[in-house]
Amino acid sequence: MEQIDRTLATEKNIALVAHDHCKSSLLEWVKNNSEQLSHHKLFATGTTGNLVNHHTGLEVTQMLSGPMGGDQQIGAMIAEKKIDILIFFWDPLNAVPHDPDVKALLRLATVWNIPVATNRATANFLISSPLFSQESKIKIPDYEGYLKERLK
């Protein structure tokens, strides 16, 4: 599939997701970076969003809890180009009942070429990048062109 440019605005739409055993780590990371995150729009799965809002006061648009469809909601937003960055602290040592949703979420983030951090070290690298707070371009699939070709 051909690729086209997508511009990520200075103010990013950032999705925050964390498995149960990783929520405290994500919450600590958000607290440490709350000043910088306050300049962006935050979205999160249900429990994670509640915790972030309660402990930091940051405004967070909350989806359903991950196992109840929240991961899929975030994935749909990625496909609709409504999420620019995914911060997803997932637990590789414990299986979750909605593991197919987790895989689908990471797959969509890769398909749509958005920056993804799956642990604190990567999240630190990402948030410290100059691109985090400035307009930048990414390459994404040319879905409209793909459809045009397929429907000839």
From Swiss-Prot:
Annotated keywords: Lyase
Catalytic activity, as annotated: dihydroxyacetone phosphate = methylglyoxal + phosphate
Gene3D superfamilies xrefs: Methylglyoxal synthase-like domain (3.40.50.1380)
E.C. number(s) listed in UniProt: 4.2.3.3
PANTHER family (alphabetical): METHYLGLYOXAL SYNTHASE
UniProt function note: Catalyzes the formation of methylglyoxal from dihydroxyacetone phosphate.
Protein name: Methylglyoxal synthase
